[in-house]
Amino acid sequence: MKILYSLRRFYHVETLFNGTFVLAGRDQETTGFAWWAGNARLINLSGKLLGAHVAHAGLIVFWAGAMNLFEVAHFVPEKPMYEQGLILLPHLATLGWGVGPGGEVLDTFPYFVSGVLHLISSAVLGFGGIYHALLGPETLEESFPFFGYVWKDRNKMTTILGIHLILLGLGAFLLVLKALYFGGVYDTWAPGGGDVRKITNLTLSPGVIFGYLLKSPFGGEGWIVSVDDLEDIIGGHVWLGFICVFGGIWHILTKPFAWARRAFVWSGEAYLSYSLAALSVFGFIACCFVWFNNTAYPSEFYGPTGPEASQAQAFTFLVRDQRLGANVGSAQGPTGLGKYLMRSPTGEVIFGGETMRFWDLRAPWLEPLRGPNGLDLSRLKKDIQPWQERRSAEYMTHAPLGSLNSVGGVATEINAVNYVSPRSWLSTSHFVLGFFFFVGHLWHAGRARAAAAGFEKGIDRDLEPVLYMNPLN
């Protein structure tokens, strides 16, 4: 299809670098983009852009497969995953592959299979990417109209959105099928310290599922990050799957309403900015999820959360001193508050000391010792099991720290194992990526709005303050 506007008029941002450089028969003069603007040269070449996207998917899947095999090759079954710097095997273990009671790895073969499948898939995607980038048609509109598009075609854009939503919904259903029928998933809350189990009693009540979305994001509430049982997680994926699939069908069958046509900018760069904003939100949510949640991210694989390590230390010393004859119910600490136990603002019995700030932690090794009013003194005296002692001592020395500020009283450096927790890696990386994607969203949204408003340039350099200043020398 013929493009109706002049490219140079439409792409408003001047690029004053090497304007004479010609690459693949394209130069800055005819495209409005310099060589370093990469895929911008492909904005109106749907076939070439398809090649770039498929090749990019191939790189992503190649990394997943290669890193997966790298982790399998370096894996030591005798050590916990979180002590070995692993970030992919914990995800596979959480899905119930290769692990048994207590999160012990029984078989690494499923992990090997996963790596090989991803490598093979990446080869297929890589071939497709190279084919479409070099050999396939430059544009798809003429030969494959179903796959062709023009960025301004609002109806086609919402159809593509619908197809994406259906695929996301099917992805959510894959997790549901794994949990219900194909071996189950790892449940850190299973009695006796966690196990793989099939989820039989799904939470489908909209009040519960959407209650998470309506909760406050702050302490003790924690929005969706506070989810702490697998029935709710898998039930949420059932809801999400249906919402995405039906939303996708709706977007395929309908055209954008007038208010939507007016509200949005309808250009390739605008869609890029919307996508970056969504990915930024995902990154920030993932950061909070992996940092605070020990149900979707079991501590057996990812290491304890910060609050969990701090509470584990308080518990470990309570056990030790109780054995040495301390009366943990009444001992006073240096501040006059309880040394081992105290009361929260709402009256529950909680651990004393600096870890009091984490009093709303829930963890499978601790919950059996709670009664209706918080920690139960008689259970603490009579019911502590060896596995709870072992696990809390292990978690106490593997806090996800590395911080310059207060660490909730956790013994760091000299007394602890020197390691970096996967929770630290995953939450920090997703926060940083979320931030950069947000900056990318602002950048591309600004450019897209400027183009829609008809500016050709960014700032007018004639009014640049530096032009009126004396040279430094």
UniProtKB/Swiss-Prot annotation:
The keyword Repeat does not apply. The keyword Plastid applies. GO terms for molecular function: chlorophyll binding; electron transporter, transferring electrons within the cyclic electron transport pathway of photosynthesis activity; metal ion binding. The modification N-acetylthreonine is found at residue 15. Signal peptide: none annotated. The modification Phosphothreonine is found at residue 15. It comes from the Eukaryota. Gene3D superfamilies: photosystem ii from thermosynechococcus elongatus (1.10.10.670). Keywords: Acetylation, Chlorophyll, Chloroplast, Chromophore, Manganese, Membrane, Metal-binding, Phosphoprotein, Photosynthesis, Photosystem II, Plastid, Thylakoid, Transmembrane, Transmembrane helix. Pfam families: PSII. The chain crosses the membrane at residues 69-93, 134-155, 178-200, 255-275, 291-312, 447-471. It is found in: Plastid, Chloroplast thylakoid membrane. One of the components of the core complex of photosystem II (PSII). It binds chlorophyll and helps catalyze the primary light-induced photochemical processes of PSII. PSII is a light-driven water:plastoquinone oxidoreductase, using light energy to abstract electrons from H(2)O, generating O(2) and a proton gradient subsequently used for ATP formation. NCBIfam families: psbC. Belongs to the PsbB/PsbC family. PsbC subfamily. This is Photosystem II CP43 reaction center protein. It comes from Brachypodium distachyon (Purple false brome).
